[in-house]
A protein has these predicted regions:
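Conformationally flexible catalytic loops at phosphate/diphosphate-handling active centers
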Residues: 40, 169-248
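Glycine-rich beta-alpha junction loops
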Residues: 114-116, 176-183, 262-264, 315, ...
């Protein structure tokens, strides 16, 4: 989980939001369109200060609805573009995100998740898992979703997200949370211009003598055509399954498996250490891609462990995908905090002990 820093790299102490924005500039984005909302406003602020120095475009739109439609237009013109928001702002973008997915345009959307539902709180949460991983907007579509667990990954995953978005012509999302956005850590920044950009063959360029004009649309009146587009999308999503990423921590001898992503996985890593000090053989599986989801490794580990416990900062969302992947091979339990509350390692260890005692009494 922790990156070894090279003394020759550009190493800085930065907030997660700032590291993400700086990485995006170094990834060569042409434009950023956004609207301020806590706890991700520093992303827009950083772009406003730095993008003009590097000949990029930054626009504070009048709303999140406007932001995502600016992304739609700029992506359709072949630009490398990004927006960011937090939970209720992402909800306002959902119609536009669905259009972008249907039109098969690459872009990066960042959700610095905060507590809800409703306007909620500005504290960190993982309550947007379903919204992010299951599509969120209308129709059968998926985003590629990456879940960072450190400020370093807030920067690194920008490059990964753009690579995947452009490889598959699909919107990608970095699903972070308010704590990761606000915390400060050392980060090794990538070199500027290290993510190559090439002219997009599918982009609209107006009239041209060199090729047929492209039409970017998500409107298909004939049901046969709409079904064919859906079939193409589903075939693409099958290919995206090859991009699954995860991290295993002390799973080789584990009898109890924690499953957690993002900030919760950092808490669980400490809980694993504390549990092992008590003689409990606990391991951790950390999904890095939430879509595609690491179903295969969960299915394999389910045959080796007594039970699984998912730790989330919500009422229980990823646990459903874990249970589906385990497919009855072992019990799957859930422990969560809601509304912006963060579970502690001690709470996790206590829950492990309670479940272990219950499990042993049933054997």
């Amino acid at each position: 989980m922790e990156k070894v820093l090279n003394k020759n790299e550009d190493i800085r102490l930065m907030k997660g939001n700032e590291a993400l924005a700086e990485a995006a500039i170094r990834a060569g984005i042409h434009a950023y369109f956004g609207y301020p909302i806590t706890p991700q406003s520093e992303v827009l602020e950083y772009f406003t200060l730095e993008m003009p120095k590097r000949k990029g475009i930054v626009v504070q739109a009048e709303s999140e609805v406007a932001s995502i439609n600016m992304i739609y237009g700029a992506a359709g013109a072949g630009a490398r573009v990004m927006t960011s928001s937090s939970s209720p702002g992402i909800s306002l973008m959902q119609e536009g995100i669905s259009y972008i997915a249907s039109a098969q345009l690459p872009c990066l959307i960042v959700n610095v998740n905060r507590g809800g539902p409703g306007l909620g709180t500005i504290q960190p949460s993982q309550g947007d898992y379903w919204q992010s991983v299951k599509g969120g907007g209308h129709g059968d579509y998926h985003l590629i979703v990456l879940a960072p667990a450190s400020v370093q990954e807030m920067a690194d995953f920008v490059f990964d997200a753009f690579r995947l978005a452009e490889k598959y012509r699909n919107p990608a999302m970095i699903l972070a949370d308010g704590a990761l956005g606000q915390m400060m850590e050392k980060v090794a920044l990538p070199s500027e211009g290290s993510l190559p950009y090439s002219e997009s063959s599918w982009a609209t360029t107006g009239k041209t003598k060199d090729r047929e004009r492209n039409i970017i649309t998500s409107l298909f009146i004939e049901p046969e055509k709409m079904e064919q587009i859906n079939i193409q999308l589903q075939e693409k999503y099958k290919k995206i399954q090859d991009e699954v990423r995860y991290e295993e921590i002390q799973t080789s001898d584990a009898e109890i498996l924690l499953v957690a992503y993002g900030l919760s996985s950092r808490i669980c890593q400490k809980a694993v250490d504390q549990a092992r000090e008590k003689g409990l053989r606990v391991g951790l599986l950390r999904p890095i891609t939430l879509y595609p989801f690491p179903k295969k490794i969960i299915s394999e580990l389910a045959l080796k462990v007594e039970f699984m416990l998912t730790i989330e900062m919500n009422a229980g969302q990823m646990v459903e995908d874990v249970a589906l992947a385990a497919n009855g091979r072992c019990p799957v339990h859930f422990k969560g905090r809601m509304g912006g509350m963060i579970p502690s390692p001690e709470e996790v260890v206590e829950e492990i002990e309670i479940l272990l005692e219950k499990h042993l009494s049933e054997v």
